[in-house]
Amino acid sequence: LLDRVYANGFARLPVGRARYGVMLRDDGIVFDDGTTTRLGEHRFFMTTSTAKAADVLSRLEFLLDSVWPDLRVAVTSVTDEWAAMSIAGPHSREILSKALEGLDLSDAALPHMGLLEGDFDGRALRILRLSYSGELAYEVYVGASGGEAAWRRLLEAGEAHGLKPYGVEALGALRVEKGHVAGPEIDGRTTLDDLGLARMAAKRSGYVGAVLGRRPALTRPDRQRLVGLMPVDAGERLSGGAVLFGPGEVHRGHGRGRVTSVTYSPTLGTYVGLGLLAGGAGMEGTEVVAVHTMKGEAVRARVVSPVFLDPEG
């Protein structure tokens, strides 16, 4: 099932390891992304984007009922069974080790994209070493009734390091700095290639969207593809939804692309953004004008790599 619904393969994923995967619609457009962890030979733990959780489950149920009824596979939502939280940052391993004593969180025991299962006050515990923020990070899953206790224990263990809760806006800022795509980029119009993820696609053709994804309209070299954007004047702010034009072009129509996500980067001391621009990476080093008609804005921006920080990490 996983090899059919994800564009990348999962058959060779070892037990105890996770993999990032991307699902396509029948027409080859990106549907959703997330990670799936192999718990056992025939058991997997799948996560999706928040917005598409119900849609993904519905999609899997439809495919199993109507398209592949011969597959002996069952899918079940376990969202209500787990309390989930993420801890990220340079001290995350130290804090987690203090909060959950007795667990080996070393690189050897829990490598990147690895799984560790254990017990938390008599409740099931799963720790995944995954990072959406670009920092050393862990996803902690505890049996639902133990969620508050686990949360408090993490806060207590992290007090000496200044651990603070962070919400979706902070997480959004971190993911933009790392060039990670989310809902604004996976908007029902983009392909794997548009998002810089084409290398993930398996060479086989047995997954949903593989055939129609090769249509000429979806493989044109002038399609809008993911880029990074930085204001030429560091004091100016980009706006999400702004239309991108070339310097000197009349600010009318659909332009050359659009700004999809924007955040202020404390590290870089300026606003940065992700966008979809005709020519994609080939436009890096050039300038565009981000025009937001309703706000009366026309901001000059440099086209750069979508990975603003630590491209090797």
State the predicted function of each range.
Residues 39-313:
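Conserved, structured C-terminal
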Residues 1-43, 47-66:
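Extended, compositionally biased flexible segments
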